[in-house]
Design a protein with these regions (language model features):
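Flexible, glycine/threonine- and acidic-rich loop/arm segments that mediate assembly and lattice contacts
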Residues: 1-383, 387, 404-409, 425-502
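C-terminal regions of proteins
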Residues: 391-418, 424-430
Length: 502
């Protein structure tokens, strides 16, 4: 009689290796998730360099030209300049409260209406500065620092009044709430009369802008007791780093190492500085075991703090709508460093949105060349597999190279939290003098600094303790494998980076 109990089953029923029959065994694990490691992003776009301090500090240039975005027309000849949210900084005399305006007498200005309503919106007027800035106010906490600049328009009209066929551009209600009085100004030159002198003219001192970051210590440990190191399994171990054999602890130790190497990169991408009133800062103050825990600024945090964020790319539809979104990004790049070559690291949804955008522009996606334009040379025919993906493209004066970022797609990392879709990284470098090499080197904007000296290299330390596996450091009947790294990420010129979010 045929019964279920007549069949050998090791996964169901009561059969096990106590039976005399051997099942058909696959000794190797199936790699159902492929290569599970996600590191490699920073190796692709950055570099690693040693450091010998608890902090890395760098300075970045400010803008060259004088411009103020938040100003208002007070009357026909007066513009009130908000000095604090400026693009350039005038002669710094000390504290914020004594910050001076960088506009000088006889400067020529463009006054542009950037309010929300009124006849002056989107229009500009040229004026001459007739007196040095006066009436400095504010500058304390929460109170903007302002001054008044007296000007004379080059047109027959004043800032607020009309003359002849011309009309006054701005209503001049100033702080009384007139929406049409909001303006931005920038200096485009100066005009002086014959025989003039500049004895009373102040010079502009560039403001010093610095940023800093501190390394964090990342640690992990693997432990196996002495008895289990001799435990032979029936599954052959094979991991991403080449470890193989029938000892299961080899797999455990290898995966601990691989996971730690991924953490070394993930911590640089996701790192967050502890806010003054945060729980982490409170623990560090009140618990001796956590003294010094202050976090580190990772890539995402640096871009959110000093860079740009684009929400819901192609959210209104693909094709031309997505192209309009991308043109908005180009306008922002023009506004910043205008670095020609940029890299796009995308999750699946952003990569497909960009592919769809480019395919829509290409005539092959629009029912033939009569409805669109084909760019480049394509050797497709009916017997070939079509390639709908794009690795790179040029728009305006910028080149973009697109690649998938596994970290954003993996279900156990950012694929689980889908609020970040991608990042734009400029292919920019800065020239610095390397004291260790004694030469000038070009350093990428994005790079890792790790603690190292002649006594200790903490880029990636690994050591074994216990009394098993060749280590005889204690009476512990176990092998402990320790991992440690001390590092931080330096994100320079973050104003050229962009984060794509949902």
């Amino acid at each position: 009689m045929t019964l279920t109990t007549n069949y050998l089953s090791f996964t169901e029923g009561e059969n096990d290796f106590a039976q005399q029959y051997l099942p058909e065994l696959y000794e190797q694990e199936v790699e159902r998730y492929g290569n599970r490691t996600i590191a490699g992003f920073l190796r692709m776009v950055g570099a690693e360099m040693p450091m010998t301090s608890d902090q890395v500090v760098w300075s970045e240039q400010n803008r060259l030209h004088v411009a103020y975005e938040t100003c208002e027309v007070i009357d026909d000849t007066t513009i009130r300049v908000n000095i604090d949210p400026d693009f350039t900084v005038g002669p710094p005399v000390g504290a914020v409260g004594s910050k001076e305006c960088a506009i000088k007498v006889n400067n020529t200005l463009v006054v542009y209406g950037n309010g929300t309503t009124g006849a002056g919106i989107g229009k500009s007027m040229k004026v001459l500065v007739t007196a040095a800035p006066t009436n400095y106010q504010g500058g304390s906490a929460g109170v903007p620092r302002t001054c008044d600049v007296t000007v004379a328009p080059y047109t027959a009209s004043g800032l607020t009044t009309s003359a002849g066929p011309e009309a006054g551009e701005f209503d001049g209600s100033g702080s009384s709430g007139g929406l049409n009085s909001a303006v931005a100004v920038f200096v485009y030159g100066s005009e002086w009369v014959k025989g003039s002198n500049t004895d009373a003219l102040a010079s502009i001192e560039p403001d010093f802008t610095q940023y800093s970051n501190s390394p964090i210590i990342i640690r992990d440990k693997f432990e196996i007791n002495g008895s289990d190191t001799a435990q032979i399994g029936w599954v052959e171990v094979a991991t991403e780093d080449g470890t193989s054999g029938y000892l299961w602890y080899l797999k455990s130790e290898s995966e601990t190492r691989l996971r730690f190497e991924d953490y070394m990169e993930m911590a640089m991408v996701e790192g967050e500085l502890a806010a003054t009133n945060s729980a982490v800062a409170g623990i560090a103050l009140n618990n001796a075991n956590y003294t010094g825990n202050k976090g580190t600024q990772g890539l995402f945090a640096a871009i959110q703090d000093r860079g740009h964020e684009f929400q819901n790319f192609a959210g209104t539809g693909g094709g031309n709508a997505a192209l309009e979104d991308f043109d908005t990004i180009l306008a922002q790049l023009d506004f910043e460093g205008a670095i020609e070559e940029n890299m796009l690291f995308c999750n699946r949804s952003l990569a497909l949105a960009i592919d769809n955008m480019l395919a829509n522009v290409n005539g092959s996606a629009q029912a033939g060349p009569s409805n669109g334009a084909s760019y480049g040379l394509f050797e497709n025919d009916a017997s070939m597999a079509l390639n709908f993906g794009f690795d790179g493209f040029r728009r305006g004066s910028y080149d973009f190279y697109k690649t998938d970022w596994k970290y954003l797609n993996d279900a156990s990392t950012r694929g689980l939290a889908k609020d970040i879709e991608g990042v734009l990284v400029p292919a920019g470098t800065s020239t610095v003098y390397d004291q260790m090499l004694g030469t000038n080197i070009r350093r990428p904007f994005l790079h890792v600094r790790y603690r190292a000296s002649e006594a200790d290299d903490r880029r990636l330390k690994s050591w074994v303790t216990g009394s098993v596996g060749g280590a005889y450091t204690s009476s512990l009947d176990a092998m402990e494998v320790h991992f440690l790294s001390e590092r931080c990420l330096v994100t320079q010129a973050a104003n050229n980076f962009m984060l794509f979010t949902t």
